[in-house]
Amino acid sequence: MKQDWKPGTMIYPLPAALVTCGSCEEEYNIITVAWVGTICTNPPMCYISVRPERHSYPVLKKNMEFVINLTTKDMAFATDWCGVRSGKEYNKFQEMKLTPGKAAMVQAPLIEESPLCIECRVKEIVALGSHHMFIADVVNVKADDKYLNSETGKFELAQSNLLVYAHGGYYELGEKIGKFGWSVEKKK
């Protein structure tokens, strides 16, 4: 038997991402965002959803670009801390000893400790209610060499210990149990 619950956003898990924004060092900020995802494959597009009252909101709106920095188990404390502290009061890079790096295609910094940094340029902002959705083109992706398979060049997801968010908690991803299309693959 299933129970009826009030409507809610129960789509979990989600990436526990650190989104970076700002066009100069004085305005650089990090915001923890779980409302982040893929919108389109071709052209590659992502979104983040941010409350308008957040410190990063006007910075995002002014510069119209950001970097989605995926996080790891080792970054869990910093990920949570950056979500409960305001950039008005703290330099989050300094406080969490995270290293701002130069992105290739946007002015916003990336986080050097992140295994995967997705550089985005905003196309549209959609006011939805509690959050506004920043719809963006992916203009570059930086992947840490230590997580790339030396033979295939593919990103080794399992070895990166990516962090995810689910219903108020942080979790690391588990083991791979299949791959896309494995259910219809012909047996050899």
Feature map (PLM): residue ranges:
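Basic, polyanion-binding surface patches
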Residues: 1-188
